[in-house]
């Protein structure tokens, strides 16, 4: 067996999957798992792997993929079992699909994902599942000044986004981080400058805006490629300060949208003042969104781009880069804006709340996860809205309704009393209550409560007891409230049957005996929640953390700690 060939295969596969950089440990683990007979030679194998990984990492991503396709095309095939998702086949067909699609989800890691950003992630991945191909995760983080990536002691947005996608059930075939591809962008910038398709502009911003609005060229547009390349080198050397020089793509100065006219491809950002969390102050000349996206979509072989309608002008801007290089632009599908009634999706507003990103009051994916929303409910919501070009408005209650359908079968029923008062009455016989854990799944069993004969004491909710009224204690008996004194209600046994309660219109209320104190966290508004203390059945102590339950006449909850539940929805 040729160890070097085995190492090359897995190093190339690892590098292609993770943006061009193979990892020695990952390659070693793969080799030992796939070729166990090499385990006794681990030290020898590691030396070979280290040398091969170094050689592979020196290649461009395009070279890595080409070599892998030539020698081991099967290594590029998708091997993970693919989940069948209801609704995927109902999505409208994409145009110009040839065998499979290459799609991408490209978040800016200046914040974590929320319900709105789940839409492009799910839709792109859904088409990847529908047609086969590749799904790319690309972090677009080339603005360390105004859209600085969020990396703090509390949260690393890069990892948080990965975690959110895994929770959603979205897995990626390749991953890229744009801030680690700066040399690639520099290379293509030089090519455009040498072609005369771009130029270095030294105009003052206000002068440029005046010329642009008049549809006139700035003086630097006619510079020779040699002059532009010299100015480009000076930009890289730090000879210009912020705002003194930019690189512009030559477009159409008469374009009806002034923002399309010779848009900025590179600008200077003083990273000594605003260092990038991943690459520090290594670079001061940074590509703009539209330039980096154009280069990456081509080099990564993206075939279809699904994104929000607000990006339509960006598609126009990017078309000029594709035209200058003679590349085919990906098929682009723009879908309408998704508005969620009852949820704030603005990053700036969410940041201003100054609460943890996984706070259950927030519509972030981490917040929804903490609250008890299932990823399957989010999938169903997004696939129902689909990729229609018109704007859509969906109430947060729609998501709750979908989630309710999914947790209802697994959520056992329990009695819980908020704002409790003691109810005392005399029983002339033994009263027996059999409370099933789930009315639709009787095989799960029931709790049996035996009270009386004699004095009976239970706890009920304060608002349920009114003098002179008859109430039905669920599964137990009908009691007439005679008087209420302070925190105690006194009553008498009225009757036993449910039929009698219905006949006289007695409300059915919850009650607990020998209870445990239960705390319920209720999300109230973004950044605001209240904690309610009540009494619950003692069997709630046995509910596992993470399990769902339904409190009768209250709503669905999820256990998050000893005797602590979070309110999910009604």
UniProtKB/Swiss-Prot annotation:
The protein, known as: Glutamate--tRNA ligase
Its job: Catalyzes the attachment of glutamate to tRNA(Glu) in a two-step reaction: glutamate is first activated by ATP to form Glu-AMP and then transferred to the acceptor end of tRNA(Glu).
Similarity-based family: Belongs to the class-I aminoacyl-tRNA synthetase family. Glutamate--tRNA ligase type 2 subfamily.
PANTHER family per UniProt: GLUTAMATE--TRNA LIGASE, GLUTAMINE-TRNA LIGASE
Class in the EC hierarchy, top level: ligase
GO molecular function: ATP binding; glutamate-tRNA ligase activity
Motif ('HIGH' region): 107-117
Subcellular location: Cytoplasm
One GO location term (cellular component): cytosol
Organism: Pyrobaculum calidifontis (strain DSM 21063 / JCM 11548 / VA1)
Gene: gltX
